[in-house]
């Protein structure tokens, strides 16, 4: 089994800033969890000569080369051609791939496959084909001398599917061991704080990994183990997971979830509770994140984006004299918004957000980053006062995180940190 890897992303759009390379981060986590050390990330534009040169350099410093992008049917999709030229491997037509693509076009597009798509069925001779049920471009893995090359689509959801369902099982088969992993989610602590609490548990070993990485507003831990089978892997991870939960306490909010919003929806669904939201500075972000999850309609009744005082008054019935006395960005208005949307929708629970995401503060001396998050429940209304740093996007993202965290804490009988 390859022990070292280089990830090579192909696409001019990745270099001109038009597209963010999310595939590299995901693949690095997957390979690391599988026991493959990622040594380099390389990005190459849509130029065959430069890609061939990159392959020549990479094969001298890593055993596994993982390529993303450039597998489609257009003129600039030349990854297979350049990689096979550099590794002296011919391309051959794979008839089973042709049939897969024809069925996909008939099912999804209700038409015949265009002739130009036929080039996607040409793959390296002797390769293991990675079929693609979520797109048209197949991937593959093959070995040339001491180099193993894996070719994956560049479209993120296709790349992720193929990496998880094709590349990872292939690595396990080659190694003769099973790899299993869990992503643990933490909110309310910084990465250094997590490391301080878990210091002796963090490790990168041959058969066990527990490593932190941060995203805006939260910290995640990648826990993975290798063993003879899935049961053995889970048995190795169980005591570590239990210790992480014990040390982090209320800051640990879930494993293998998409985010705080999924945790909140699950908790509400289990308790038969409904939810609503009133948003000002987040501009509908809370509602979006909830409705991104299938089945959210069982819990989320609706939301109001009350960006102006007029809408706060007319729709949420926030008193005009309250706005005049306290200002739109205040604990009092956050309370009124949360209660107003709960009454309006008839929801069991409601959250509200009002704040200053920038670029300027308000005329009452509140600086950018001042945010109030309200939670209205049958027992009453609580408010969390935040002072957040960063740009407009970060402030909005963190504000939504805190709204979900207040809900999570309420639903699990933890202090909501209201004031």
What are the language-model segments listed below?
Residues 119, 232-419:
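Short alpha-helical segments enriched in small residues
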Residues 142-217, 222-224, 232-237:
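Accessory alpha-helical/coil subdomains and C-terminal extensions
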Residues 50, 56, 60, 77-174:
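Proline/glycine-rich low-complexity loops and linkers
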Residues 40-50, 387-390:
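Short beta->alpha junction loops
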Residues 2-41, 234-235:
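Glycine-rich phosphate/diphosphate-binding loop of Rossmann-like nucleotide-binding domains
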Residues 10-12, 67-75, 153, 226-227, ...:
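Glycine-rich beta-strand-to-loop/alpha-helix junction loops that act as flexible
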Residues 5-7, 149, 275:
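Conserved hydrophobic helix-helix packing surfaces used for dimerization/oligomerization
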């Amino acid at each position: 089994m390859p022990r070292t890897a280089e990830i090579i992303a192909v696409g001019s759009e990745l270099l001109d800033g038009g597209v963010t390379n999310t595939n590299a981060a995901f693949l690095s986590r997957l390979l690391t969890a599988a026991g493959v050390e990622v040594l380099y990330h390389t990005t190459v534009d849509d130029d065959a000569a430069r890609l061939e040169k990159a392959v020549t350099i990479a094969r001298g410093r890593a055993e596994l080369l993982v390529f993303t992008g450039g597998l489609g049917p257009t003129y600039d999709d030349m990854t297979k051609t350049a990689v096979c030229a550099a590794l002296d491997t011919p391309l051959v037509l794979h008839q089973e791939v042709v049939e897969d693509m024809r069925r996909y076009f008939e099912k999804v597009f209700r038409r015949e496959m265009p002739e130009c798509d036929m080039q996607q069925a040409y793959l390296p001779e002797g390769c293991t084909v990675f079929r693609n049920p979520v797109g048209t471009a197949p991937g593959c893995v093959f070995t040339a001398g001491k180099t193993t090359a894996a070719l994956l689509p560049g479209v993120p959801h296709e790349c992720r599917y193929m990496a998880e369902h094709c590349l990872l099982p292939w690595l396990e088969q080659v190694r003769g061991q099973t790899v299993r992993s869990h992503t643990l989610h933490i909110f309310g602590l910084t990465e250094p704080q997590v490391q301080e609490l878990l210091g002796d548990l963090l490790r990168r070993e041959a058969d066990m990994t527990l490593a932190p990485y941060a995203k805006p507003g939260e910290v995640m831990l990648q826990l993975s183990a290798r063993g003879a089978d899935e049961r053995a892997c889970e048995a190795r991870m169980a005591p570590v997971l239990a210790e992480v939960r014990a040390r982090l306490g209320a800051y640990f909010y879930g494993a293998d979830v998409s985010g705080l919003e999924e945790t909140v929806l699950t908790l509400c669904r289990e308790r038969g509770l409904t939810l609503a939201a009133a948003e000002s500075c987040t501009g509908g972000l809370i509602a979006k994140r909830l409705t991104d999850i299938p089945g959210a309609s069982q819990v989320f009744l609706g939301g109001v984006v009350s960006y102006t005082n007029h809408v706060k008054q007319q729709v949420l019935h926030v008193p005009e004299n309250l706005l005049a006395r306290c200002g739109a960005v205040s604990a009092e208005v956050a309370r009124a918004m949360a209660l107003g949307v709960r009454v309006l929708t008839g929801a069991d629970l409601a959250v509200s957000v009002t704040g200053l995401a920038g670029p300027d503060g308000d005329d009452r001396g509140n600086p950018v980053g001042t945010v109030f998050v309200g939670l209205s429940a049958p027992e009453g209304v609580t408010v969390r006062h935040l002072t957040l740093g960063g740009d407009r996007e970060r402030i909005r993202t963190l504000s939504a995180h805190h709204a979900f965290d207040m809900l999570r804490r309420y639903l699990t009988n933890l202090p909501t940190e209201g004031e």
